[in-house]
């Protein structure tokens, strides 16, 4: 990864005209291709500053490496090593102000 792509993949969301009639998840999540493309943005820093921005101390580079290899089960287990509530943290974490801002 010589240079990180500055362009983030936006997370697909339900259309507002659809979601105003249901209580389903707004964020639809990435496709496999989008997740891998997003993981490929990581620079693999020798001293990853992103981890200093994570209050839960998730091993972000290892998590991203699993996603890059499409090992989503491994990525999930990597997060579980440090966070017992990954689904909740994933919804409320302002990653753009924490880990991503350190990158």
Each language-model region and where it sits:
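Ferredoxin-type iron-sulfur electron-transfer modules and their immediate structural context
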Residues: 1-102
């Amino acid at each position: 990864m010589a240079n990180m792509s500055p362009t983030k993949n936006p997370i697909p969301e339900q259309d507002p005209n659809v979601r105003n009639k249901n209580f389903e998840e707004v964020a639809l999540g990435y496709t496999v291709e989008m997740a891998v493309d997003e993981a490929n943005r990581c620079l693999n820093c020798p001293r990853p500053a992103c981890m200093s921005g994570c209050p839960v101390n998730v091993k972000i580079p290892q998590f991203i490496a699993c996603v890059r290899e499409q090992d989503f089960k491994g990525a999930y287990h990597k997060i579980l090593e440090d966070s017992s509530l990954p689904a909740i943290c994933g919804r409320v974490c302002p990653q753009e102000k924490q880990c991503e801002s350190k990158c």
